Amino acid sequence: MSFKIIGTGSYLPPLTVTNDDLAKTIDTSDEWITQRIGIKSRRISEDESTAEMGYKAAKEALIKSGTAPEELDLIIAASITGDTICPTTAGGIQKLLGATCPAFDINSACSGFVFALDTAAGFFARGTVKKVLVVGSERISKIVDWKDRNTCVIFGDGAGAAVLTEGDGYLDSKISTFGGDDVIKIPSGLNLSPYYKKETELGKIHMAGQETFKFAVSRISEDIKYLCDRAGITPEDIDRIVPHQANERIIDYAAKRLHLPKEKFFVNIESYGNTSAASIAIALAELDHKGGLKKGDKIILTAFGGGLSSASCLIEW
């Protein structure tokens, strides 16, 4: 037994920061950002925590699925920007919902939401859960260097969620980690020990753009081919592909490598930027609520991120 998705939700904070807004504080322009990344604006949290945004996305997903918080058997939250090291983001969402089930976090950067889905699949396979809430929520703005034009223009805040129940909709997956911190790195920025001798780096995002780009294009195309080969289908047979929204040019290159029309890929990076672990969850909810998915559709969710990591899954709607 696996699972099927019965409800999705998303939340974006109200403050919109445009490329022109950023151009007032750093050396950049709307044209530069749009051509290189495909982003026009992003949402930034002014007073909402990671858990609070996750709660709002979760609440919408629960309503869409007709599920009460007390019906949940498990909550998994994917995030790298938790409000505290302890307790967990999932625990904060649980409290806000008034749920009583176990709740824990997964930290796998932008791949986190798909890692969380794959983790949930194991609980369903063992028959220990009937309804699971999976959330991706990020307040990336708090770890961005807003003076670095190569990174601050990319990211945004937000949350997405999905409610899962028993079913046969989760067909296959591929999750990978390529250990190393030289391409995408966020130091903890914390050291109170008088005995630790190494210099402590500030907890802000460091990213090697070209290496990230190459890795992303290769992982998207290879993971999609892998899942299709195992299912005995071709990429052309996939109805929709929901990729991590990191850079529209990555999606363009992956589509060309797979010889697929770009229209098969759902893209919303223009309005929200890269929301890390929330990215695919937000995109899936938007596609769902716009009526872009129908029963029986074969969908691939495909992500890549720090770790380095990648995660893709084949689901039937």
Predicted features and spans:
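Condensing-enzyme catalytic core mediating Claisen C-C bond formation in acyl metabolism
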Residues: 1-47, 148-214, 218, 222
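Beta-strand segments within the central parallel beta-sheet cores of soluble alpha/beta enzyme folds
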Residues: 33, 70-78, 104-107, 130-137, ...
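Conserved beta-ketoacyl condensing-enzyme motif
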Residues: 5-7, 48-108, 228-252, 257
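Conserved small-residue
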Residues: 5-7, 33, 61, 75, ...
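Active-site-adjacent elements of ketosynthase-type condensing enzymes
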Residues: 22-24, 81-92, 131-152, 175-196, ...
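Conserved beta-strand-centric core segments of catalytic alpha/beta enzyme folds
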Residues: 1-19, 117-181, 284-317
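A contiguous, well-structured pocket-lining segment that forms one wall/lid of small-molecule binding clefts
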Residues: 200-269
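Conserved catalytic cysteine-centered active-site region
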Residues: 34-36, 40-52, 79-132, 256-284
